[in-house]
């Protein structure tokens, strides 16, 4: 029998103080029963002696401190999990949104999970094909990696996220592949886009969707990424699946964290975010990876919008410390009509060399990647010089590099949001572009690969 308390003494915004409590724990769920019988949910944020500070999941409107009562449920937030989750759409708290029945669970898991023992981690080493040349060819995603996408307000990161979720696959393996997609603090229009896109393309069948709308409570926004990762851990480590987790938008998550922190009157850190923002983000990002004792894996792509396109803002800054690289979207490329507008030069995948080469992608991948980076960087320099001094100031070689840079953006980076390129197609396009330059300029590629692949590219 659950004990009921009629000792609510204060309600301030989303917070409520309950006195004279016994045996209540941090993170415990509770229910508030109003005088009219309505039930609202809450969660314990802090326990000080016999006082418990709880956060409401819903509005505090209508709560009367004299007539309302609280009971604590003795458990934290849990997610019921089973294979039936695939193909379903849930709220940020794990409730079905698609009109289907509740999940009959194999088990119930605490959404906070457990940290993965560093000694039990397996090193990421298998290539994941996203079908996007700028990622597969130059900033390769590896199974078990944490690779964020840094975007800006108004850039098409939603379309890119949907494209990756549709197209991602692990090559050369019989293991099943699943996608867990968590949308945090998005508008109804964006939610409708994601759900419709996954259903239209059939990707919904291998996907678990968690949708948290902008008008949902902040506490739900904080729970949504953890719901997604809990589902991913079940699919990966209990069922042996390769799971790709995409979370958009981490900025909305951090804003919710700041809102809760301000309500608790905590001492703010940089830009008003709580001082524990780094630690809190790490509890999300570090749940990705591979385990020695499991065939499954969790690969994480968190997407965040940089306020004012500022890479030094606390959210992208701290995310960069925890994760293994970043994919950066460019407003300049977006204005040029390049889709997806991935700026390959400042982008980085720190584990890309572990997932490419003979037996994984192709033997010439590393050499062509390095040469494409170098040629594009020099081509951009040549174009900047031409703006200042005019085309006449460029040498014939510089003009070829400028031509290469334009062709690279148009043919390699830009592919639209519906084209799914194989890694062979991506490498073929790379060689075709490199054939614009004289062979003497291709100093980063071994002669054996030049002899083997360059003549074919020149013919195309």
UniProtKB/Swiss-Prot annotation:
CDD domains: ATP-synt_V_A-type_beta_C, ATP-synt_V_A-type_beta_N, V_A-ATPase_B. Keywords: ATP synthesis, Hydrogen ion transport, Ion transport, Transport. The keyword Transport applies. The keyword Magnesium does not apply. InterPro entries: ATP-synt_VA_C, ATPase_a/bsu_AS, ATPase_F1/V1/A1_a/bsu_N, ATPase_F1/V1/A1_a/bsu_nucl-bd, P-loop_NTPase, V-ATPase_su_B/beta. GO terms for molecular function: ATP binding; proton-transporting ATP synthase activity, rotational mechanism. SUPFAM superfamilies: C-terminal domain of alpha and beta subunits of F1 ATP synthase, P-loop containing nucleoside triphosphate hydrolases. It comes from the Bacteria. Pfam families: ATP-synt_ab, ATP-synt_ab_N, ATP-synt_VA_C. GO terms for biological process: proton motive force-driven plasma membrane ATP synthesis. Produces ATP from ADP in the presence of a proton gradient across the membrane. The V-type beta chain is a regulatory subunit. PANTHER family: V-TYPE PROTON ATPASE SUBUNIT B. Belongs to the ATPase alpha/beta chains family. HAMAP family: ATP_synth_B_arch. This is V-type ATP synthase beta chain. It comes from Acetivibrio thermocellus (strain ATCC 27405 / DSM 1237 / JCM 9322 / NBRC 103400 / NCIMB 10682 / NRRL B-4536 / VPI 7372).
